Each structure stands twice: as structure tokens, then as C-alpha cells.
């Protein structure tokens, strides 16, 4: 949004824009920046196609998918999808942490202000993070009359969402969401932690172009990593990026512009609690699992 256009808004909406808009922080991202599993990619590709053909839909009284709910553990790409989509298509992105606004004591007014701002700005994404903080199934948080009033208010705001805007929400607690809240979304995406089949592709995605990446891990190491990851609940794309950056830093500190697959794997294994010599630990694990050709 240009400064000139911003100045034309009422002061309270200018303040809302400055507080919730994160558009400048996502510059340079695009839909190639995010790694998606095949299932989610199909869903997201359809979401993108509808968005790209939205003007054609409008002519026939149709609306593109514009309410998206993402489930999944932290670090699996829920927030990053909103950032990449907004940056790729040049949309304003307003991020609302529902846990924070609840504690502010003025939650509905804040939400209403963001939705009103989006109506003025148009072509924007409202991203509701930690939506489980208010949209819990009856019998939990919703016993609180203030929370019930807030969720009912949010329903009305979502139902009146301008067709040019998109509302995206994210939660780690799929099972606890209010069913009426879930039904208001056109698209539901289930994000999983990356399985091993995606680890190598993910590593390469995060490598700086000035670094050379040497794939030197043998099949035993790869097998051990695959088996280990199956039972590790903390793995995320964000962690993989951290491991790649750590390997790049080590290379720089040692006067190199290259690092190996094994180096990154070592960080992965250490983060999962491997304290022995890597190969000894891997060998022991493979033996315990009955793997052959160690």
C-alpha cells in the first residue's frame, strides 16, 4: 500500500495497518519458496488457480476459494504458506495473533478493525494465528461467555469477508476446534512434519547458491536417518533450515564454500539425541532394527 493511499484512511485504520501489516517482512518470497507434500501441493495449486481466475468467476456470480484453514504442528509451513502466497501475488498480509489480542482485553474491536481495513485495502490476506485460542469446541474455552461472544463476532466478520480478500487461519490443535468455525472455511489443509523422502529436497532448497553441496552419505546412513525420523516428533522444515545454516556457518569458519550431506545429517541426528559417535550410533540403531549390510 502506498503512503499516499495509507494517509487517506482514518487514523485508527492507519494505526491498525502499521501494527498488523507484515508485507514488508515477506519481500522476496514466492510460491517456489515453500516445500509442500504432494497432497497439499495439489490442494494449494487448485487454490492458486482459482485465485488467478477469480475475475472470470465473478462474472458468473462465483467466488474463488478465499477462506483457508491450516492444521499441523509448529514449523510445518502453515504461516509460511500465507507469507509466500501474499508475496507471490502482491497481496497485503495482516497477521493477527489471537492469543495476544485475547489478552489485550479488546479482542473484538481489534478483529473488526483488521477486517474493516481489509475491506478498504482489498486484495489482502488476513492471517489468524492460533485460532484455537478462541474457536474451541463447546465445553472448553467456549464456556466463557466473552469467548463465545468473540467467536460469534468473528463468524459475522468472516461471513462478510469481501470477495477480493482472503482469510487464512492456523492451529496446532485440530481436534479442539469448534465445528461451526471449521465449516466456514472452503479449504482445509493438513500439514505434516516432513518425512525423510523430502529431507534431501528440503536441504537443497535452503542452501545458499554460493555454496557447493556434496552428497556423500551412503545408504546405511540414509537408512538410519529414515528410521530415526519416523519416531521423532520434533522435526520441521524450520529445523532443517537451521541445520543447513549451521553447516554453512561451519564451512565459512573453516575457510570453505562447500559442505557435505553427512555434515547436515550429523546435525539432524544430534538434534534427535544422538550423543555417541555418529557411525557407531547409526550402526547400533541399524543392528537393533535388524537392518542388513551395515
What are these regions (language model features)?
Residues 1-33, 196-294:
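C-terminal alpha-helical "lid" subdomain
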Residues 36:
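Post-transcriptional modification and biogenesis factors for structured RNAs
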Amino acid at each position: 500500500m502506498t503512503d499516499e493511499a495509507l494517509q487517506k484512511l482514518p487514523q485508527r485504520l492507519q494505526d491498525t495497518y502499521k501494527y498488523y501489516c507484515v508485507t514488508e517482512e515477506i519481500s522476496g518470497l514466492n510460491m517456489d519458496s515453500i516445500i509442500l507434500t504432494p497432497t497439499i501441493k495439489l490442494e494449494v495449486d487448485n487454490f492458486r488457480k482459482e485465485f488467478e481466475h477469480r475475475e472470470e468467476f465473478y462474472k458468473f456470480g462465483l467466488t474463488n476459494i478465499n477462506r483457508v484453514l491450516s492444521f499441523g504442528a509448529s514449523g510445518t509451513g502453515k504461516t509460511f504458506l500465507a507469507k509466500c502466497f501474499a508475496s507471490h501475488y502482491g497481496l497485503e498480509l495482516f497477521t493477527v495473533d489471537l492469543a495476544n489480542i485475547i489478552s489485550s482485553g479488546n479482542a473484538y474491536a481489534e478483529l473488526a478493525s483488521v477486517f474493516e481495513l481489509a475491506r478498504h485495502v482489498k486484495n489482502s490476506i488476513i492471517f489468524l494465528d492460533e485460532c484455537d485460542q478462541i474457536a474451541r469446541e463447546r465445553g472448553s474455552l467456549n464456556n466463557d461467555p466473552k469467548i463465545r461472544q468473540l467467536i460469534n463476532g468473528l463468524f459475522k466478520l468472516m461471513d462478510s469477508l469481501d470477495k477480493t480478500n482472503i482469510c487464512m487461519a492456523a492451529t496446532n490443535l485440530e481436534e479442539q476446534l469448534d465445528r461451526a468455525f471449521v465449516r466456514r472455511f472452503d479449504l482445509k489443509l493438513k500439514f505434516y512434519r516432513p518425512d525423510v523422502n523430502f529431507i534431501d529436497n528440503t536441504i537443497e532448497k535452503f542452501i545458499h547458491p554460493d555454496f557447493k553441496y556434496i552428497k556423500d552419505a551412503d545408504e546405511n546412513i540414509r537408512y538410519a536417518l529414515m528410521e530415526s525420523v519416523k519416531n521423532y516428533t520434533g522435526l520441521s522444515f524450520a529445523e532443517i533450515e537451521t541445520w543447513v545454516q549451521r553447516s554453512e556457518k561451519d564451512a565459512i569458519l573453516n575457510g570453505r564454500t562447500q559442505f557435505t550431506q553427512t555434515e547436515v545429517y550429523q546435525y539432524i541426528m544430534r538434534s534427535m539425541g544422538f550423543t555417541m559417535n555418529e557411525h557407531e550410533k547409526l550402526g547400533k540403531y541399524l543392528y537393533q532394527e535388524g537392518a542388513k549390510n551395515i
